[in-house]
Amino acid sequence: MSDAAASAVALRNLKPWVYKTDITKFFDEINRETLKDVIRRKVRHRSLHNMLIDAASREISEPNKSRAAKVKKLGVMKNCGVRQGMPLSPFFSNLFLHEFDRAVENARLSMVRYADDLIVLCSSHDECLDVDSFCRNALDKRGLKIPPISETGKTQVYAPSQTAEFLGLGLIPDGKKYKLDLTTEQKEKIRRRILQFSSVTYLADNRVNIFNFGRKLDGVIAGYLGSYSCCASFNDLEKTLDGLRSKVTRTLFKDTFNIDISALSPPGLAFLCIPD
């Protein structure tokens, strides 16, 4: 993801107008029969075909009515789409959009795509509108849609003086150039995500216990650090995440176990992974 965002900001230094969109319900709308056909045509090793087709046909487990209701509420339909979260999901998305990517390449558009998020760098507002028409027509051939252009929706046009958002990062004007950094909204999302670990209810709902708590929390933090290593304020992000880790751990042990953190010795703090 960081490579895609870095490519986008590099291209914006050449073409300052930005067209950004998000394919509507992409993974849920993938036509499985079309995907199976693409797998058979594009994957050379036939021995892999059945395995890949089986993976693409997987459904979300519904062990009880409550889980089934949640799945239905998300709009996930059986026998349609590819389930997000699988290691192969990005591979399937690239296979399914292969013809679209070729059309973009043939049209010589300066596009960066990451799964269902895409951004095209342009030289003018009119070019952005032309790109919008092109993308709609090309994606329609795959049975896919994108939202209409608006100032606050998922399809937007950004002028050279505006910060363009892509993959949770901002392509921010910085003098005559552009820099890549976290948007205020994404910083807040990260903060809320980490602070969820201080709620016992959240932990129980997500099968996090005393034995895997530290590993789960560190995994989420490591994911953010890996994804946003290209940010201009990466050092500040590291400090913020360290502070949130400490806050979560202190809050959890204080509120859940009534531990007086201030009375703990340095070894006790270290055992609970709390900075002294």
Model-assigned labels for residue ranges:
Residues 9-115, 119-142, 148-149, 158, ...:
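Conserved polymerase palm-domain catalytic core
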Residues 73, 102, 129, 157-276:
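Right-hand nucleic-acid polymerase module
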Residues 151-153:
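The conserved 3'-phosphoadenosine-5'-phosphosulfate
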